[in-house]
């Protein structure tokens, strides 16, 4: 099964919620009323839902489903130039492989989102692109944190920089950057503890890790990626805001899209934070994490 089919299968719950009740061939107001309920239920959020309805109503289009598709694709595109091209009817090139801007990617997120597994999948993805990848097991507050990443490292033949439980994660991140440079690796993914976004001191710890990376290399980290569980819906948006305030996100990875009817939460995340979705995950397999393509996502969301 190709990734589009897996994405489509993964979005089945969200798609059912969006499509089931909408009488696309009915009169405009009837369609918009059902569409509003469906978008809100899929966690698109009130503000984004109102914007979608307003634009669809103003478009005067007969094919309402196509009008909704175009609007959703535009909202999932934080790059204004590409979004404008789409509005003008041009179809920008499909996204190329996701190339991190620098060599260090700091990976953050709350407990239980599958952060460590996602890092392993990222390692596999970049290995397949011919990159030399290294991991830093910075989740030193959790007994199994380093062990889990270490096991993945063995399976993927990726070196893992780690210390005993309770090691200062900032010091470990510093050492990992030095090791990456000394050994000539292309990419370093720094795992972090599954911090609860409501715990201020844990956010401070994250800032400290980011500063330590910058001390080891003033150019880094150019990328800070948040791993978010789609099942959390609107709460995921609140998490993203807190992390963005603390460490300045450059991308979001959304996991477990196959386990929720709240896949619409991607829209307010991009719209509110102006941060792109880098990857989406729709399964447990090592290849079930793929670069995010707004068009393929909306197609999978709205196609019967």
UniProtKB/Swiss-Prot annotation:
<keyword id="KW-0378">Hydrolase</keyword>
<dbReference type="GO" id="GO:0005737">
    <property type="term" value="C:cytoplasm"/>
</dbReference>
<feature type="binding site">
    <location>
        <begin position="109"/>
        <end position="116"/>
    </location>
    <ligand>
        <name>GTP</name>
    </ligand>
</feature>
<keyword id="KW-0963">Cytoplasm</keyword>
<dbReference type="GO" id="GO:0005525">
    <property type="term" value="F:GTP binding"/>
</dbReference>
<dbReference type="Pfam" id="PF02881">
    <property type="entry name" value="SRP54_N"/>
</dbReference>
<dbReference type="GO" id="GO:0006614">
    <property type="term" value="P:SRP-dependent cotranslational protein targeting to membrane"/>
</dbReference>
<comment type="function">
    <text>Involved in targeting and insertion of nascent membrane proteins into the cytoplasmic membrane. Acts as a receptor for the complex formed by the signal recognition particle (SRP) and the ribosome-nascent chain (RNC).</text>
</comment>
<dbReference type="InterPro" id="IPR004390">
    <property type="entry name" value="SR_rcpt_FtsY"/>
</dbReference>
<keyword id="KW-1003">Cell membrane</keyword>
<dbReference type="InterPro" id="IPR027417">
    <property type="entry name" value="P-loop_NTPase"/>
</dbReference>
<keyword id="KW-0547">Nucleotide-binding</keyword>
<feature type="binding site">
    <location>
        <begin position="255"/>
        <end position="258"/>
    </location>
    <ligand>
        <name>GTP</name>
    </ligand>
</feature>
<dbReference type="GO" id="GO:0003924">
    <property type="term" value="F:GTPase activity"/>
</dbReference>
<dbReference type="GO" id="GO:0005047">
    <property type="term" value="F:signal recognition particle binding"/>
</dbReference>
<keyword id="KW-0472">Membrane</keyword>
<feature type="binding site">
    <location>
        <begin position="191"/>
        <end position="195"/>
    </location>
    <ligand>
        <name>GTP</name>
    </ligand>
</feature>
<dbReference type="GO" id="GO:0005886">
    <property type="term" value="C:plasma membrane"/>
</dbReference>
<dbReference type="InterPro" id="IPR036225">
    <property type="entry name" value="SRP/SRP_N"/>
</dbReference>
<dbReference type="GO" id="GO:0016887">
    <property type="term" value="F:ATP hydrolysis activity"/>
</dbReference>
<comment type="similarity">
    <text>Belongs to the GTP-binding SRP family. FtsY subfamily.</text>
</comment>
<dbReference type="InterPro" id="IPR013822">
    <property type="entry name" value="Signal_recog_particl_SRP54_hlx"/>
</dbReference>
<dbReference type="InterPro" id="IPR000897">
    <property type="entry name" value="SRP54_GTPase_dom"/>
</dbReference>
<protein>
    <recommendedName>
        <fullName>Signal recognition particle receptor FtsY</fullName>
        <ecNumber>3.6.5.4</ecNumber>
    </recommendedName>
</protein>
<dbReference type="InterPro" id="IPR003593">
    <property type="entry name" value="AAA+_ATPase"/>
</dbReference>
<dbReference type="Pfam" id="PF00448">
    <property type="entry name" value="SRP54"/>
</dbReference>
<keyword id="KW-0675">Receptor</keyword>
<dbReference type="InterPro" id="IPR042101">
    <property type="entry name" value="SRP54_N_sf"/>
</dbReference>
<keyword id="KW-0342">GTP-binding</keyword>
<comment type="subunit">
    <text>Part of the signal recognition particle protein translocation system, which is composed of SRP and FtsY.</text>
</comment>
């Amino acid at each position: 099964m190709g990734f589009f089919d897996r994405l489509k299968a993964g979005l089945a719950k969200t798609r059912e919620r969006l499509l089931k009740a909408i009488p696309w061939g009915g009169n405009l107001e009837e369609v918009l009323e059902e569409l509003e309920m469906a978008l809100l239920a899929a966690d698109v959020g009130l503000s984004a839902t109102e914007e979608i309805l307003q634009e669809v109503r103003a478009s005067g289009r007969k094919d309402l489903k196509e009008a909704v598709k175009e609007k959703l694709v535009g909202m999932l595109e934080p790059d204004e130039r590409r979004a404008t091209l789409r509005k003008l009817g041009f179809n920008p090139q499909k996204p190329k492989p996701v190339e991190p801007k620098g060599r260090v990617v700091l990976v953050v997120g709350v407990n239980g989102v599958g952060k460590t597994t996602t890092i392993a999948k990222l390692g596999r993805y970049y290995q397949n692109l011919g990159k030399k990848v290294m991991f830093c097991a910075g989740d030193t507050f959790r007994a199994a944190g380093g062990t889990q990443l270490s096991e993945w490292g063995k399976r993927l033949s990726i070196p893992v920089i780690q210390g005993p439980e309770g090691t200062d994660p900032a010091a470990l991140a510093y050492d990992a950057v030095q090791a990456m440079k000394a050994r000539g690796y292309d990419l370093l993914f720094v795992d972090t503890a599954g911090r609860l976004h409501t715990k201020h001191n844990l956010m401070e710890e994250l800032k400290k890790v980011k500063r330590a990376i910058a001390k080891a290399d003033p150019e880094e980290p150019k990328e800070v990626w948040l791993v978010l569980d789609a099942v959390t819906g609107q709460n995921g948006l609140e998490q993203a805001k807190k992390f963005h305030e603390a460490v300045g996100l450059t991308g979001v990875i959304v996991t477990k899209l196959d386990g929720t009817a709240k896949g619409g939460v991607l829209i307010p995340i991009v719209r509110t934070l102006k941060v792109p979705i880098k990857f989406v995950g729709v399964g447990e397999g090592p290849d079930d994490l793929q670069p995010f393509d707004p068009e393929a996502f909306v197609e999978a969301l709205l196609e019967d």
